[in-house]
């Protein structure tokens, strides 16, 4: 999943990167694959707002994707986080995990039709999250 916020565990990209930055002893920052793989992330507050909107306005048995159309490469995500943390990094590429995807971007057209609007950009969400760690 690409929902992020505080206390979300360490199994996904953003919390894993935060953990790596906390324990970074050199400027080398490991990323899997080329770093050009893309994802879309949604801050937990926006996710909850979208879910509540679905409860109120979603069609029974309808399928809705909750997310954003804000796409970012894994390399640019790490760079954004390093800038916010004032850390200089040099990327060290590792093989991509078996079954890894090059791009993940949800089609959110249906949820937008019932009024969903992202309120917290990725950069703003990361700032909020990094204040808490």
Model regions and ranges:
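C-terminal substrate-binding subdomain of Rossmann-fold SDR/epimerase-dehydratase oxidoreductases
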Residues: 23-133
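Flexible, glycine-rich beta-alpha linker
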Residues: 1-14, 37-38
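Active-site micro-motifs of SAM-dependent methyltransferase domains
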Residues: 2-5, 19, 49
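Mobile, glycine-enriched helix-loop/loop "lid" segments at the mouths of ligand-binding/catalytic clefts
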Residues: 11, 20-21
């Amino acid at each position: 999943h690409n929902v992020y916020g505080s206390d979300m565990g360490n199994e996904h990209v953003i919390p894993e990167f935060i953990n790596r930055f906390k324990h970074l002893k050199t400027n080398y920052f490991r990323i899997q694959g080329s770093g050009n793989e893309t994802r879309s992330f949604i801050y937990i507050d926006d996710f909850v707002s979208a879910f509540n909107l679905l409860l109120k306005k979603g069609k029974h048995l309808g399928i809705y994707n909750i997310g954003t159309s804000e796409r970012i490469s894994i390399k640019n995500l790490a760079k954004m986080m390093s800038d916010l943390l004032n850390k200089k990094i040099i990327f060290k590429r590792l093989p991509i995990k078996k079954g890894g995807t090059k791009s993940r971007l949800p089609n959110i057209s249906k949820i937008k039709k019932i009024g969903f609007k992202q309120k917290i950009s990725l950069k703003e969400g990361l700032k909020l999250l990094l204040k808490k760690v």
